[in-house]
Amino acid sequence: DPAFSSWG
């Protein structure tokens, strides 16, 4: 996800 790029 853009806000949580560690999660994708």
UniProtKB/Swiss-Prot annotation:
Modified residues (Glycine amide): G8
Signal peptide: none
GO cellular component terms given for this protein: extracellular region
InterPro entries per UniProt: Kinin_peptide
Coiled-coil residue spans: none
Keywords: Amidation, Neuropeptide, Secreted
Entry-linked Pfam families: Kinin
GO biological process, one term: neuropeptide signaling pathway
Secreted listed as a keyword: yes
Cell compartments where the protein resides: Secreted
Entry function: This cephalomyotropic peptide stimulates contractile activity of cockroach protodeum (hindgut).
Name listed for the protein in its UniProt record: Leucokinin-7
Organism from which the protein derives: Rhyparobia maderae (Madeira cockroach)
